[in-house]
């Protein structure tokens, strides 16, 4: 795969950096939630951390035959706290990706005819919408001192990061079309 044009390349590198940091942040937040007695919220953080890793991998793979050292600029909320604060940080990060980052990156990649980057950005955008809603629901419970109830499991599509809660995965991913039997269970 040939390296993308410079503006798309920069967007992919920035998105890779942001998703990589989200993966680590959510992994740390999971440990905190576990210690505070919110095992389902911890499971949610771990599942979405995996989804963010999927997004980072997809962006990285679309960089093609790039051979460069680069400084990656990626904004991220910092300052871990208790689980309620961490959920607020997670919601803020997801909403930034939904409302600003991915719509802008999609426009850049579309304007440059970078189809694979557009796909990667769109897949991540759709998954982030679900992540934000799940984090909002979790925060409502945590703010009442309760763990978020999860009926079944949290399922993550290993291709695009789509996130689903239920006893079984969907038969097919509604974002990328991957078979549900390939989903990772949390």
What is the predicted function of each stretch?
Residues 1-186:
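Non-heme di-metal
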